[in-house]
């Protein structure tokens, strides 16, 4: 009887470990190719474009923004492609200064571009507080 109980317990623990490892990471900061990457999917859930959330990944090396990449969203592709132009303005800037930059929205894609700017600001603020 004891052996059967121990086998059940071991199976249960293995199942729990497997499920825990399959869960998505919730930490917004990770490392990729030598860069610190901030993902705003969970950081800025309340930031909305015209059709919904507009999360980004911000790549930072040596304290400077290397790249900002828009993630999957529900924005209208035609307008969102124009809105993404604001992201290039952050590249090459020091993270602490980029977080405070004044970036204008894109005409015709105002909601989307403003949401992208707010996502970048939230991500850089988080980076500064947790690096």
Q: What are these model-derived regions, one by one?
A:
Residues 2-114, 118-131:
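Flexible, solvent-exposed loop/hinge segments and secondary-structure transition points
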């Amino acid at each position: 009887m004891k052996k059967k109980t121990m086998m059940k317990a071991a199976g249960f623990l293995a199942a729990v470990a497997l499920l825990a490892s399959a869960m998505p990471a919730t930490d917004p900061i990770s490392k990729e190719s030598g860069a610190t990457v901030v993902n705003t999917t969970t950081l800025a859930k309340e930031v909305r474009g015209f059709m919904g959330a507009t999360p980004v990944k911000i790549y930072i090396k040596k304290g400077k923004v290397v790249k900002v990449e828009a993630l999957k969203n529900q924005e209208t592709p035609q307008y969102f492609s124009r809105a993404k132009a604001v992201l290039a303005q952050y590249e090459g800037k020091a993270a602490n200064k980029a977080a405070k930059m004044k970036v204008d929205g894109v005409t015709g894609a105002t909601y989307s571009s403003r949401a992208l700017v707010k996502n970048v600001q939230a991500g850089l603020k988080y980076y500064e507080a947790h690096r």
